[in-house]
Amino acid sequence: IAPFCHGPAGLLSAVDAAGASIFAGRRLTVFTDDEELTGGLGENSPWLVARTLRERGALGEDGPAWREHVVRDGNLISGQNPQSSEAVARTLIAALAA
């Protein structure tokens, strides 16, 4: 799975039978709270993706704002923002080729 930017929001609904996130303890990156707020949309959002994933146990790894940043944790490849899209694609292609 290779979400980037706000795509990891789709991971929030993936829970086990007890209701715990199946991504708890997994390393990933997502559009940061700082990027949400400096981008001008965060103050209008009822919740922030990065914060919510961390609250549910994901191990968020933030790179510099608005810069390419990719995290790979096994078969989970994630990119922080739109600037990371090409790097996510390259990492996914390399993972599939291995």
Where are these regions (language model features)?
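Active-site-adjacent pocket-lining segments in enzyme domains
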Residues: I1-A98
